[in-house]
């Protein structure tokens, strides 16, 4: 069986032999980040921007479905018809959308 001193020396030497691999790996990932990841993010941003430009800004036609926007009792805040996080540009009331939409 090997002595503890020889085991420690063997560990130090084996660790030193692998020291050169770490720098190459970091360099590889750095290159991959600049060559693949950044252009990929740029393509995704361009795609999202083009989709946003094509998006229709007209509101959908309001249809008063009987199973939606049921009010059995008033909300305890405001006029009782608007939910706590009501957004007049996105959320319809039982009567329809509020005012002009953009």
Swiss-Prot record:
Coiled coil region boundaries: none
Pfam families: COX6A
Keyword hit for Oxidoreductase: yes
Mitochondrial intermembrane side: 51-102
Pathway, per record: Energy metabolism; oxidative phosphorylation
UniProt transit peptide range: 1-13
Cited InterPro entries: Cyt_c_oxidase_su6a (IPR001349), Cyt_c_oxidase_su6a_CS (IPR018507), Cyt_c_oxidase_su6a_sf (IPR036418)
UniProt record, GO biological process: mitochondrial electron transport, cytochrome c to oxygen
Name the UniProt record assigns to this protein: Cytochrome c oxidase subunit 6A, mitochondrial
Purpose of the protein: Component of the cytochrome c oxidase, the last enzyme in the mitochondrial electron transport chain which drives oxidative phosphorylation. The respiratory chain contains 3 multisubunit complexes succinate dehydrogenase (complex II, CII), ubiquinol-cytochrome c oxidoreductase (cytochrome b-c1 complex, complex III, CIII) and cytochrome c oxidase (complex IV, CIV), that cooperate to transfer electrons derived from NADH and succinate to molecular oxygen, creating an electrochemical gradient over the inner membrane that drives transmembrane transport and the ATP synthase.
Chain segments carrying region Disordered: 1-25
Cell compartment(s), UniProt: Mitochondrion inner membrane
GO CC annotation: mitochondrial inner membrane
The family this protein is said to belong to: Belongs to the cytochrome c oxidase subunit 6A family.
Membrane topology of the entry: Single-pass membrane protein
Self-association state and partner proteins as the record states: Component of the cytochrome c oxidase (complex IV, CIV), a multisubunit enzyme composed of 14 subunits. The complex is composed of a catalytic core of 3 subunits MT-CO1, MT-CO2 and MT-CO3, encoded in the mitochondrial DNA, and 11 supernumerary subunits COX4I, COX5A, COX5B, COX6A, COX6B, COX6C, COX7A, COX7B, COX7C, COX8 and NDUFA4, which are encoded in the nuclear genome.
Keywords: Membrane, Mitochondrion, Mitochondrion inner membrane, Oxidoreductase, Transit peptide, Transmembrane, Transmembrane helix
């Amino acid at each position: 069986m090997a002595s503890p001193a020889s085991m420690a020396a063997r560990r130090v030497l084996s660790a030193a032999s692998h020291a050169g691999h770490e720098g190459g790996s970091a360099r590889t990932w750095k290159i991959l980040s600049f060559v693949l990841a950044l252009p990929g993010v740029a393509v995704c941003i361009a795609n999202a921007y083009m989709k946003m430009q094509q998006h229709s800004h007209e509101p959908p036609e309001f249809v008063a479905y009987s199973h939606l926007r049921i009010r059995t009792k008033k909300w305890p805040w405001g006029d009782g018809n608007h939910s706590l996080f009501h957004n007049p540009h996105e959320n319809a009331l039982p009567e329809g959308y509020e005012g002009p939409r953009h």
